[in-house]
Amino acid sequence: MPAELTYEATSRELATDRGVLRYHEAGSGPPLLMLHGSGPGVTGWRNFRGNLARFAEHFRCLVLEFPGFGVSDPTDDHPMMAAGGAVGRFLNGLGLDQVDVVGNSMGGIIGAQFAIRRPERVRRLVTVGGIGPNIFSPNGSEGIRLLMEFTDDPSRERLIRWLRAMVHDQRLVTEELIEERWEQATDPDTLASARRMYGSKAMAARAKAMAQSDEPPYWAMLHKLKARTLITWGRDDRVSPVDMALVPMRTIPDAQLNVFPNCGHWVMIEQKAAWESAVLAFLTRKDEQ
């Protein structure tokens, strides 16, 4: 990694009325907001550090760390709620009127919801897995079940099982990755936040609330998304199976779908070069007149 793209060299802070938001910044050009996913030990840096060098050649890359994941200030809110509010505060704090957004899994959902609420602020949206309803596995995927098991009762063995479900190429689950994720995932504030999202009690309460609610699920609102959208997916994703892509592909008015073979949930890591090429082609394509 170039010296100018290290963790320390790219780290930034932004004070807001809801605490400090931390982020990484690299490159110059049009702003590209990069939103991380969820899960044990996740951070924006770990999701996108391998992609920064190439994207920073074209964009001012802004990798936001959501509250509740151990980097930005902690929150007592549900992580999804905290993340949604953080995006608006972050862009306002930096004085950015419009951005392109790349969102991994949960980050893609947050990006889509923000683009629906504030269509003038998102030019183009890229999602990585995670967005849409489970069609063939309505009771939750293997990866989500493993995530719940770890969150309820953390152990290195459960973490390793979950990590192995994240990738097609098992060689990516290295001791370095395990140790890095374990240290972050077992931080008390981070674990408490994870339990509000993925603990079995929280998941059961959420399912009950959704069944009783008159509000439509987020994916039923995707037809309101005006931003041109690229949906990217790993064919062998065991966390958010590729059948989930069918609804957003059909309902987002201006959407295209790229599916990458021999690839699990972390498309931007496991199919790095192909994914970067597809995303850059999409983001730099001239707007149609």
Go through each PLM region and give its residues.
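Conserved HGGG/HGGXW glycine-rich cap/lid loop of the alpha/beta-hydrolase fold
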Residues: 17-71
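Active-site loop/oxyanion-hole signature of alpha/beta-hydrolase fold enzymes
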Residues: 53, 63-102, 277-280
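Gly/Ala-rich beta-loop-alpha elbow adjacent to hydrolase catalytic centers
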Residues: 103, 107, 111
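Flexible "cap/lid" loop of the alpha/beta hydrolase fold
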Residues: 112, 116, 123-161
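Conserved alpha/beta-hydrolase catalytic His-Asp/Glu region
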Residues: 138, 155-221
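Short beta-strand/loop motif that positions the catalytic acidic residue
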Residues: 225, 231-233
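Acidic catalytic loop of the alpha/beta-hydrolase fold
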Residues: 236-240
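Catalytic active-site module of serine/aspartate enzymes centered on a nucleophile-bearing elbow/loop
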Residues: 255-289
